[in-house]
A protein has these predicted regions:
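A conserved ligand/cofactor-binding region detector
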Residues: 1-750
Length: 750
């Protein structure tokens, strides 16, 4: 079907006579119908990828690309005087995720569909997502982020289940979003909602009655957990998700002929982080309800469930108080106790018990009763095996494996950077769109001046696009000829946005002293801080204060500017990543499981400035030392220092004059004049007296390496070679490769 026919059928108009809104909804209808007409992935055995988050981003352009009609639609629009970019702006971004965990899940379902595998994503249909971030007086404020409209991507199904909590029962409803594979088949994102959800209990902020479960259950992703009511609500949410998922799994297996004793032949469950962990006892409970005895039910579930660990941070491995579960899901506690008793009967190491110190350890349950445990980057998996989960690795060495994360090149190159995609196709053909390893062929052009010039021109165009977009959206005045130095990711101390901010202060002082950079520098930040994460919000406050001070200083702003984008999301990422020159991946070594932003930037020709952490290690191995800028202490040094417990941040502060000057500036009159003294002093004291993620030991190395990167940028031809090497080596990080490995080594769907 053509767009002209679609708008004629819907509005009885020509494209020229339609508004952009009308064209958008006609395109939405057309693509939904085309997706429904595609053959769904099928097979006896099915994967259920259960995740609390799916950060899918806007769907229109990605679906048009995967359906193979993007260029045709773009041409039709242009012939009628319309701009596809303006049409895309109308779409609201689904508020179904937050950070890398959710974006990974979204990339994975895209690859599952593209590879023709029989698998669905399963999660919750959040109405307001995490929150919409707004800046007010240099502070983060949180407001609801609605996205659901009557005419949208969600399709209401007839599937509904009663879900029993302690003292009351709620009714669920399943909504589907079709996930379109690239020139292939489709799969589904299956999102459960509560029938009694009530958006009216939310006002202009994200505050609401956390105890009214029947109205609030699916309103927000990760409700504020700074109080017990918020933490308890998370338990209700997680059980609601897995209870519905478990029933769906059993119903679909039975419909295909399973007697449930053979469930492992019909279903495999990937537990994405610890949020869906209760699916293990819930499946055991439901199998017992259907007549299977406890012993066999446990054996069946242990052959069905697999667990992905996404973190090295102990606080992120969920542990719920027993009394939470006894209140919210009392029917699960006898099963969880039985699972724990069986562990105790065969294992003497108390640190591996499921129930310990009045807490239920979700990851422990996943490891004992899952058939696979995987990390998400080589370094991460090695740290799990040798350190963080070593006690479990000794018990089950055969369960542990690595699956380095990946990204979908459809969204993160073809959709967000069509100019670079076209250049690549002109050089090596379009086989790379299906087999990302073909990007290696670009290595043949590293000494071709015409190719390097074109690559620089593509980058310059994307930088101009970002400048214009951010000027339109947020009023930023950006020098498109400056170095675009970008750090965009969830705000967390281990990701060390605070170290980047300290460098900005250091550079500010250098410029004030007359040491001006050869090329102007624009430092971009984008990050949301969890509402209850006070220090993270203080870091945002500092960055916004620096933005105000530096950008309004006529002595400094011609050489250095700072911009923090508001409400960073997938849509903004798709604008920023293609424009980036230097990708900041500066987490404390040993703390970032993998990262996927590093891969997206690399694919779009940015050079990584990073620690040897997460997937940075594999990027460095692929591109070589000349094509990445690494700094900082190695992971083992960091792990050893934590083990000794002898880190003293103040000692670094007192012996490093550059560091001392930068840290002191946080509480200077200059910053306090545009900021809040309480927030700034709290951050200052946190760094000076704690600095838990060791910003100070890496600071000198960071300055030195960042200056090397800026110096290297001046040789444009040599820089372009480094860009091309990075793009040519990015094929390994395709989520198609990751999912193929999951399937061959864990799921075994076909």
């Amino acid at each position: 079907m053509t767009l002209a026919k679609a708008v004629s059928m819907k509005y009885n108009k020509t494209i020229e006579k339609c508004s952009n809104e009308e064209i958008y909804f006609a395109l939405l209808d057309m693509t939904k119908q085309m997706a429904e007409d595609k053959v769904s992935n099928e097979g006896k055995k099915k994967l259920y990828y259960i995740s609390a988050e799916f950060l899918i981003g806007k769907l229109l352009s990605n679906n048009l690309i995967n359906l193979g009609i993007y260029d045709d639609v773009k041409s039709e629009l242009e012939a009628s005087g319309k701009n596809i970019g303006e049409i895309e702006e109308i779409e609201l971004e689904p508020s179904l995720g937050n950070g890398g965990l959710g974006r990974l899940a979204a990339c994975f379902v895209d690859s599952i569909a593209t590879l023709g595998l029989n698998g669905d994503g399963v999660g919750l249909n959040y109405h307001y997502g995490l929150f919409k971030q707004v800046f007010d007086h240099n502070l983060q404020k949180e407001t609801p982020n609605p996205w659901i409209t009557e005419d949208g991507w969600l399709t209401k199904t007839d599937i509904t289940y009663p879900v029993q909590f302690g003292g009351f029962t709620v009714q669920s409803r399943l909504y589907d979003i079709d996930v379109v594979g690239y020139n292939n088949r489709t799969t589904k994102l299956r999102l459960f909602d509560i029938e009694t959800v009530d958006e009216s209990i939310v006002g202009d902020t994200i505050d609401f009655n956390k105890e009214d479960i029947q109205k609030n259950l699916t309103l927000f992703l990760y409700p504020d957990d700074s109080d017990e009511k918020g933490r308890l609500l998370r338990v209700y949410q997680q059980y609601f998700m897995v209870s519905n998922a478990a029933r769906l799994i059993l119903d679909e297996a039975v419909a295909k002929g399973s007697n449930l004793h053979d469930l492992a032949d019909y279903a495999t469950v990937q537990i994405n982080d610890t949020h869906p962990s209760m699916v293990i006892p819930e499946l055991v409970r439901l199998l017992q309800e259907r007549g299977i005895l406890m012993d066999e039910a446990i054996d069946i579930v242990a052959k069905v469930c697999a667990y992905t660990n996404h973190t090295i941070l102990a606080e992120a491995l969920e542990k719920w108080p027993i009394y939470f579960l006894e209140k919210a899901v009392p029917q699960l506690m006898p099963i969880i106790r039985e699972l724990d008793n069986r562990v105790r009967a065969k294992v003497s190491d108390e640190s591996t018990y499921i129930i310990k110190d009045g807490l239920v350890h979700m990851a422990h349950m996943d490891i004992h009763y899952g058939y696979s445990v995987n990390g998400v980057a080589y370094l991460h998996t090695e740290i799990l095996k040798n350190s963080e989960l070593n006690n479990f690795y000794k018990l089950y060495p055969e369960k542990f494996n690595n699956k380095t994360n990946g990204i979908t090149f459809r969204r993160w190159l073809m959709s967000c950077n069509p100019e670079l995609s076209a250049m690549i196709t002109d050089l090596i053909g379009d086989g790379w769109k299906k087999d990302a390893n073909e990007l290696e062929k670009l290595g043949n052009y590293v000494n071709d001046d015409a190719v390097l010039d074109r690559l620089l021109a593509v980058k310059a165009g994307k930088k101009a696009d970002l400048k214009n977009y951010l000027n339109m959206k947020q009023g930023f005045d950006i020098d498109e000829n400056s170095i675009y130095d970008i750090q965009v990711k969830r705000l967390h101390e281990y990701k060390r946005q605070q170290m980047n901010a300290l460098y900005v202060i250091h550079k500010y002082f250098e410029i004030k002293e007359g040491k001006k950079p050869a090329t102007p520098i624009t430092v971009f930040f984008g990050a949301k801080a969890a509402p209850a994460y006070i220090i993270a919000k203080d870091i945002i406050h500092l960055i916004l204060c620096l933005q105000q001070i530096i950008n309004n200083d006529p002595e400094v702003s011609p050489y250095l500017k700072v911009f923090m984008v508001e409400n960073y999301n997938v849509t903004m990422a798709e604008k920023m990543i293609p424009a980036c020159d230097i990708s900041e991946q500066i987490s404390l070594a040993s703390k970032e499981a993998s990262g996927t932003g590093n891969m997206k930037f690399m694919l779009n020709g940015a050079l990584t400035l990073g620690t040897m952490d997460g997937a940075n290690v594999e990027i460095a191995e692929l591109v070589g030392d000349d094509n990445i800028f690494t700094f900082g202490e190695d992971s083992q040094t960091v792990i050893d220092r934590y083990a000794r417990g002898d880190y003293n941040s103040r000692s670094y502060y007192e012996k490093d004059s550059n560091l001392k000057r930068a840290v002191d500036f946080i509480v200077s009159d200059t910053v306090k004049s545009v900021g809040c003294a309480e927030n700034l002093e709290r951050l200052y004291n946190e760094l000076l007296n704690k600095d838990w993620f060791m910003t100070f030991p890496d600071f000198d190395s960071y300055i030195e390496t960042r200056e090397k990167a800026y110096d290297a940028y001046a040789d444009r031809k040599a820089w372009a070679k480094k860009m091309l090497v990075n793009i040519s080596k990015a094929g390994f990080f395709s989520s198609d490769r990751t999912i193929d490995q999951y399937n061959k080594e864990i799921w075994k769907l076909s």
